[in-house]
Structures are given as structure tokens and as C-alpha cells.
Amino acid sequence: MGVVIGIDVGGSTTKIIGVENKSIQSPMFVKATDPVTSLFGAFGKYIYDNGITLPEIEMVMLTGVGSAFIDQPLYGLPTAKTDEFLANGLGAKYTASLENLIVVSMGTGTSFVKVEGPHIQHIGGLGVGGG
């Protein structure tokens, strides 16, 4: 099984992680004013800094407001998009090892997500801010 790359293309910052053997690897943050530039810059820097080759990448998962600008696979790799609130809920549940929690995501926008076991619900706020 290869590396899954997760990328949150935000309005001001792109966040990227790798997941290998169910372990989160080397979170990275990249700032750029253009989401496509930020995405490709973060992706290139991440795989270079971590010594990951393209054939080692199993999947690229995208989320965030900037992911709307991407309509084709990254470098021919399997690429999919997921809802940002779902990603926030699942990520927090996994990281915290909790079944029930409220997730507050504070960036240029602030959102609230409720996690109750397998159910994840956006309960308020926005994922997109004003800068």
C-alpha cells in the first residue's frame, strides 16, 4: 500500500499531509495568493522534502475552497475531492481517538463540526473567510 496525500487548498494557506500505514507523516503549510500555485507548490515541496516518488503515491485527496479550481488528476495520479467539513470531522476523530466531539476549524473562516460516532455534521460557521 502506498502513500495517500491529503491536501486542503485554503483561501490563504494550503495544508498537506501524507498518510502511510495509517500514520500521518510530516504536516506542511504553504502560503500563496493563488490556490493552484499553492497546491502545486505544496505538492512538489512535500514529495521532494519527504523523498516520495510519484509511483509511491496511491491517491491524492483534495478538499478546501481552492480544490474547486482543480478538474483533472494531479500528475496522472488517482485524485479525488471530499467535503471540507467531512474531512475536518474525520481528521479530528482519527487524531483525537474520540467518538464524540465538536471540531472547531479556525482559519480565515471558522467552522464547527459535530462528530457522533459515524455521523459527521456541519453545525455552523464557514470554511471560507475574508482574509
Question: Where in this protein do the model-derived segments appear?
Answer:
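Glycine-rich phosphate-binding loop plus the immediately following alpha-helix
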Residues: 93, 118-131
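Short glycine-rich, Thr/Ser-proximal phosphate-binding strand/loop in the N-terminal lobe
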Residues: 3-41, 120
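Generic structural signal for well-ordered, non-membrane alpha-helical segments
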Residues: 32-39, 81, 85, 126, ...
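Short beta-strand-loop/turn "lid" adjacent to the catalytic site in phosphate-handling enzymes
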Residues: 29-32, 43, 48-84, 117-122
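Conserved phosphate-binding catalytic cores of ATP/NTP-utilizing and phosphoryl-transfer enzymes
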Residues: 70, 75-104, 109-119
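Short glycine-aspartate micro-motif
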Residues: 2-8, 57-61, 101-105, 123-125
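A short acidic Gly-Thr/Ser loop motif
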Residues: 8-13, 65, 105-109, 126-131
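Generic hydrophobic alpha-helical segments
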Residues: 39-46, 88-92
